[in-house]
Swiss-Prot record:
Part of the 50S ribosomal subunit. Residues 59-89 are annotated as: Disordered. HAMAP family: Ribosomal_eL19 (MF_01475). Keywords: Ribonucleoprotein, Ribosomal protein, RNA-binding, rRNA-binding. One of its GO terms (biological process) is translation. The gene is rpl19e. GO terms for cellular component: cytosolic large ribosomal subunit. Belongs to the eukaryotic ribosomal protein eL19 family. It comes from Pyrococcus horikoshii (strain ATCC 700860 / DSM 12428 / JCM 9974 / NBRC 100139 / OT-3). The keyword rRNA-binding applies. This is Large ribosomal subunit protein eL19. GO terms for molecular function: large ribosomal subunit rRNA binding; structural constituent of ribosome. Pfam families: Ribosomal_L19e, Ribosomal_L19e_C.
């Protein structure tokens, strides 16, 4: 078989694409092999012996399936995670989530008259200072110091 390296290169330049995208009619290889000038190649392009292949896009098929799976909670285990814990949820977001839960709980306890105003204020400030990591620790503190009213 003839090597059509030079013809392919010239055709790529004329078609304004890469050499891999140049399609040469396999039945007219000899005709292409005899073409040695740019003008010859231009004529073959006009005749349709040499064509430009379409761009092959990147298929989203697998990506869509993976996205659907992730919606269901698959592929989210520790082995699939990259980066720090804070890369998924920032420190500030985490703090907001925690403090809102604690303040909600304190408000609920105050409304139910399980703690008085002074205790509420003291616990509110301690929560702001980061003394309680979660609601469980808040309740442990309340029980330890006997601050909960029955």
């Amino acid at each position: 078989m003839n090597t059509l390296k030079m013809q392919r290169r010239i055709a790529a330049e004329l078609l304004k694409c890469g050499e891999n995208r140049v399609w040469i009619d396999p039945e007219k290889v000899d005709e292409v092999a005899s073409a040695i000038t740019r003008e010859d190649i231009r004529r073959l392009i006009k005749e349709g012996v040499i064509r430009k292949k379409p761009i092959e896009g990147q298929s989203r098929y697998r990506a869509r399936i993976r996205h659907e799976q992730k919606k269901k909670g698959r592929h989210r285990g520790p082995g699939s995670r990259k980066g720090k814990k804070t890369a998924r949820m920032g420190k500030k977001e985490l703090w907001i989530k925690t403090i809102r839960a604690l303040r909600r709980e304190l408000r609920k306890l105050k409304e139910q008259k399980k703690i008085d105003r002074k205790t509420y204020r003291m616990l509110y400030i301690r929560a702001k200072g980061g003394q309680f990591k979660n609601k469980h620790q808040l309740y442990l503190f309340l029980e330890e110091h006997g601050l909960l009213k029955k």
